[in-house]
Amino acid sequence: DRHGCQPVWLTGAQAGPTARNSVSIDQLIAQQHAPNTRFPGIALGNTGRTLSYNEDGIAIPAEKKPSEVFKRLFTSPEGGLEQQRKELKKTGSILDLVLGEARKLNREMGNEDKSRLDQYLTSVREVEVRTERAEDWLDIPRPRISESQTRKLNREVPQQEVGDYFRTMYDLMVLAFETDITRVFTFSTGDEGKGLPIPEINLNQTRHSLSHHNGDPEQLRRLTESDIFNYEQFAYFIDRLSQVEDEHGKLIDSTQCLYGLSLIHISEPTRQHHI
C-alpha cells in the first residue's frame, strides 16, 4: 500500500496490513543511551502518528502538543518527592496485579487471543520499565528552564500555524539535547495520508492531495512549495543546533539527523519509490 509506508520507514520491515512490524532504529539507539539520560527516547508527531516501534513491532505513541512535551520533559510532577514516590509505588503495585492476572488468562486462551494478550503485556511491561526508570531518576533534579524559554515553549500552538508549530517542536528538541534530558527524538511531520495544508503560504490542500497531480503544472508548483516549506522548517532545526552549545561544543557537531519521506508522490508509475 503506497499510503502505508510510514510505519516501516525506520524499521525496514515489510509493509502491509497483515505484515508484522519490527523495531525502529531510533529505539535501538535509545537503548544504548538509556543509562545516561532521564528519557531514552521521545516520539513526536503532528497528527499523533508515530515513527517509533518497539522490539515487538508495536507503535510507541507520539506526543503532538508542545505544552505536553514541555511538561513531560521539564516539569516536575506536583506534590513533591514523597508524593511522587507514593504514586510510583502505587503504579508498580497495579502493574504487578495486572501482569499476574494476565498470566492466568494466558493459560486459558487460544493462539490468536494469546497474540493479542502478548501485545497488551508488552505495553504493560513498557510502563513498568518507565516506572522503574522514574524511580531511579526521582532524586535527580530536572534542568532549570528560564522564564523566557518557558513562555516560548510551554504553550499551545494551533496546527493551522504550521511554521510556528514545527519551529516550537524543533526548539523543544534542541532544548532537550542541550540539557541532555534525552538524546533521541523522532518527529513525524505528516504521513502520506495526513500531511497538513499550509494556510500561511496559501496552500489549502494537503500534501497527499497535491501528490495526486497527474502532471498538472499548477499542482506540481504547489507540491514544490509545500516541500520547500517543510525543508525550510527542518533547516531551522539545523540552524538552531548550530547556534546552541553544550559542554562539548555546538550541538550540531554531536548530533546525527535523518530527514526524508517514504513516498515522493502517488503518481509514480511503479512501486519503486525513493527513500
Regions found by a protein language model. Give the residues of each.
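Extended, H/D-rich, highly charged conserved domains that either
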Residues: 117-197
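Surface-exposed acidic, glycine-flexible loop patches that form ligand/cofactor-binding
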Residues: 32-35, 176-178, 243-252
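Contiguous alpha-helical scaffold segments within structured protein domains
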Residues: 188-227
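Flexible loop/turn segments at secondary-structure boundaries
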Residues: 49-51, 192-197, 267
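Structural recognition of the beta-strand scaffold that forms the well-ordered cores
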Residues: 40-44, 183-188, 209, 257-260
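A long, amphipathic alpha-helix that forms part
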Residues: 103-107, 115, 212-253
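A contiguous, mid-domain pocket- or channel-lining segment that forms the substrate-recognition surface
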Residues: 2-142
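Single conserved hydrophobic/aromatic residue that forms the stacking wall/gate
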Residues: 264-275
